[in-house]
């Protein structure tokens, strides 16, 4: 006997509910299989509709990027450990491309090429995602480089100036100080408002930790994004790392900010791309690099530039390593032709304890001169001439040739200028301090001093020029020429400082 208070629905109610419910929608997914495995790559079959650069998800939790499209098979670059992937495991399409978190939440963070934390902090959340690959801005959206980017290094700011929006290559053999120049440039942006991005490609973990420590010590980590793809990571992460760095930079530039991107280094990036291409059986070319290696770096560096009004800028400092000072190797020549100039670090100068070891005879800035402060231009031009004459005369002097008074004076002046260009690591100098030291050296105030004495004299001049109120910072900031009155003020201040240290007799009155 059925009671009216029975809470159970009747059969008729159940039938009506089923009929009124929307029809079920089957979940359709394309599933492939792993057919081959290599070091950092996989060959996948069964995904005929996959697109180039699409992300694929493997059943093991590793993701990969479609690199090669061939009939019946896909060449996939893995973004995780290949040892975690098994033969025959399922692979699914995602319909999306590789993206990275961008925006203010990334500042002060150390992340990998996918934006995953490397600093033992929480994941970057509440941030928009941007594809790591993007088209470079067209010509009409760019404006000429016209504003300086101060590196804080005398040898660079005076003779090889860099402008906001420029692509300036840092090139040299191993252990010549390439990373030091890049890090010192970042440290010099502390009070400029420039957002900095340091991208480590294939670097050892201890080397990256050293850079992070320097940024923390210089109170610049909060203004910097560190993207690290170490030598222990999957090759695919090292490949996409510089593109991810550019995407993060573009997000800030779109907000009108000036951004500095250091890519350390593109030699490792090129080797990684060669390794992946050979594993995927792409035809090798010169030095076994694939034929599109130039395009790989060109499309990356073309994303930097000075953009339209209110759109900010991206300054790129790519680093490349040479072997035995061979500037004509394949990758160095490619990057020299892509960029707007190069800062060449010479092993010969390193052996003479000249740091930074910038060889001004080979280094050049093709567009930065237009952005250089006028006060520096005359000093920088004379600097190159003086050093060039000094190096030529120095070669003759080694043969013991008898030298006349004028030649000895030129050698003394050249040695003083070379000493003036020495600078310790992690000690970027303000522009007016650089100008004061260089003017003092060019006018002979440091002639006859050895390296130690010249270092002490430069410190005294820096302290004195900081304490003096000569209007030098305003002259540089206002892009004014260095007047005779300003030059006289520099020399008077420098002579007084040297006199107090007991080294005033080195001045050339």
Curated annotation (Swiss-Prot):
GO terms for cellular component: plasma membrane; proton-transporting ATP synthase complex. The lineage of its organism: Bacteria, Pseudomonadati, Pseudomonadota, Alphaproteobacteria, Rhodobacterales. Its EC number is 7.1.2.2. InterPro entries: ATP_synth_asu-like_sf, ATP_synth_asu_C, ATP_synth_asu_C_sf, ATP_synth_F1_a_nt-bd_dom, ATP_synth_F1_asu, ATPase_F1/V1/A1_a/bsu_N, ATPase_F1/V1/A1_a/bsu_N_sf, ATPase_F1/V1/A1_a/bsu_nucl-bd. This is ATP synthase subunit alpha 1. The record marks 363 as: Required for activity. It comes from Dinoroseobacter shibae (strain DSM 16493 / NCIMB 14021 / DFL 12). PANTHER family: ATP SYNTHASE SUBUNIT ALPHA, MITOCHONDRIAL (PTHR48082:SF2). Produces ATP from ADP in the presence of a proton gradient across the membrane. The alpha chain is a regulatory subunit. Gene3D superfamilies: 2.40.30.20, ATP synthase alpha/beta chain, C-terminal domain, P-loop containing nucleotide triphosphate hydrolases.
């Amino acid at each position: 006997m059925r009671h009216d208070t029975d809470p159970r629905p009747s059969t008729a109610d159940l039938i009506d509910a089923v009929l009124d419910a929307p029809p079920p929608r089957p979940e359709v997914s394309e599933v492939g299989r792993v057919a081959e495995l290599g070091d950092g790559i996989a060959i996948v079959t069964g995904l005929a509709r996959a697109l180039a650069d699409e992300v694929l998800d493997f059943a093991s939790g590793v993701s990969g990027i479609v690199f090669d499209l061939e009939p019946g098979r896909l060449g996939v670059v893995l973004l995780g450990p290949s040892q975690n992937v098994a033969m025959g495991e399922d692979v699914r399409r995602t319909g999306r491309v590789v993206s990275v978190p961008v925006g203010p939440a990334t500042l002060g963070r150390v992340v990998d090429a996918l934006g995953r934390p490397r600093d033992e902090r929480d994941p970057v959340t509440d941030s928009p995602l941007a594809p790591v690959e993007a088209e470079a801005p067209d010509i009409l959206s760019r404006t000429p480089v016209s504003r300086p980017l101060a590196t804080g290094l005398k040898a660079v700011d005076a003779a090889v100036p860099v402008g906001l929006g420029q692509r300036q290559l840092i090139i040299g053999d191993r252990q010549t100080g390439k990373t030091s120049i890049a890090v010192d440039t970042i440290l010099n942006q502390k009070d400029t408002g420039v957002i900095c991005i340091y991208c480590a490609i294939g670097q050892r973990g201890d080397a990256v930790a050293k850079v992070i420590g320097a940024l923390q010590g210089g109170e610049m980590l909060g203004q910097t994004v560190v993207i690290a793809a170490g030598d222990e990571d999957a090759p695919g992460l090292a490949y996409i790392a510089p593109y991810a760095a550019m995407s993060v930079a573009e997000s800030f530039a779109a907000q009108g900010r000036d951004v500095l991107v250091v890519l350390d280094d593109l030699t490792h990036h090129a080797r990684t791309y060669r390794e992946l291409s050979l594993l995927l059986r792409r035809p090798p070319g010169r030095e076994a690099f694939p034929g599109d290696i130039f395009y790989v770096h060109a499309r990356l560096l073309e994303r930097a530039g000075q953009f339209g009004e209110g759109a900010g800028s991206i300054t790129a400092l790519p680093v490349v390593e040479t072997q035995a000072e061979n500037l004509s190797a394949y990758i160095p020549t490619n990057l020299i032709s892509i960029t707007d100039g190069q800062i060449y670090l010479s092993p010969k100068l390193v052996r003479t304890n000249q740091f930074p070891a910038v060889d001004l005879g080979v280094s050049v800035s093709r567009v930065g001169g237009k952005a250089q402060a006028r006060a520096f231009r005359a000093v920088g031009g004379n600097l190159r001439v003086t050093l060039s004459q000094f190096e030529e005369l120095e070669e003759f002097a080694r043969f013991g040739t008898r030298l006349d008074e004028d030649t000895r004076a030129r050698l003394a002046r050249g040695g003083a200028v070379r000493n003036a260009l020495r600078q310790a690591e992690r000690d970027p100098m303000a522009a007016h301090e650089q100008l004061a030291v260089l003017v003092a050296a060019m006018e002979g105030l440091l002639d006859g001093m050895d390296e130690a004495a010249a270092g002490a004299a430069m410190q005294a001049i820096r302290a004195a020029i900081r304490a003096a109120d000569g209007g030098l910072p305003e002259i540089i900031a206002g892009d004014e020429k260095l007047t005779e009155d300003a030059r006289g003020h520099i020399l008077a201040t420098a002579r007084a400082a040297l006199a107090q240290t007991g080294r005033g007799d080195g001045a050339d009155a």
